[in-house]
Design a protein with these regions (language model features):
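Basic, Lys/Arg- and aromatic-enriched nucleic-acid-binding interface segment
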Residues: 1-52, 56, 66, 76, ...
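Basic, alpha-helical nucleic-acid-contacting "clamp/cap" segments
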Residues: 23-27, 64-69, 73-120
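Generic anion/oxyanion-binding catalytic loop in active/binding sites
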Residues: 10, 44, 97, 144-145
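Active/binding-pocket-proximal capping segment
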Residues: 61-64, 87-89, 129-135
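Short, basic (Lys/Arg/His-rich) helix/loop patches that form interaction surfaces
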Residues: 30-32, 98-102, 110-149
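A short, basic/aromatic helix-end/turn motif that makes direct DNA contacts
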Residues: 57-63, 149
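Glycine-rich, flexible loop/turn motifs
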Residues: 12, 79, 142
Length: 149
């Protein structure tokens, strides 16, 4: 049997503030349609708490406009959820006729960092990785840590 080393990371929860999300939402991305779509999917995820896998399957049948809610069964945990459409979500969903753009996850995660870079999210984040008894510290700017969940 092969032996594997366990790599652990020590981090506090990293999140974006409402101001940072607003800055990302307000970015002029007219020069890059794909990045604009990624931004809209990302913002929708932030304000609904939906995982990327659920956002990628969101369709008009999940939207209840009368009650301003999203009603769907989460893919990962197979649980039905009802989510209020708040902040930017109604505007974004309407923009795409209630059917968000379908973006491959690897492209999404690769390019979503660019949103943070353009929004100048430069707060320093320290990540400590443990490999056996050794601890390796590395510092990232906040934009480098952005990804889907």
């Amino acid at each position: 049997m092969k032996h594997f080393k366990v790599v652990e990371e020590e981090t506090d929860a990293i999140y974006l503030s409402e101001k940072e999300l607003s800055t990302i939402h307000e970015l002029d991305l007219s020069d890059d349609k794909q990045l604009e779509e990624i931004r809209d999917v990302f913002i929708t995820g932030c304000f609904t708490g939906l995982r990327y896998s659920d956002l990628s399957t969101l369709s008009p049948e999940h939207i209840d406009l009368d009650n301003e809610i999203i009603n769907l069964k989460q893919r990962k945990v197979h649980k039905a959820v009802i989510i209020p459409m708040i902040d930017y979500v109604p505007e974004i969903l309407k923009k795409y006729n209630y059917d968000l753009p379908k973006i491959p996850r690897y492209i999404f995660n690769e390019r979503v960092k660019e949103l943070g870079r353009r929004a100048k999210l430069k707060q320093k984040i320290e990540v400590v990785r443990k490999k056996g008894k050794e601890r390796e510290k590395r510092v990232y700017e906040k934009w480098e840590m952005i990804s889907s969940h």
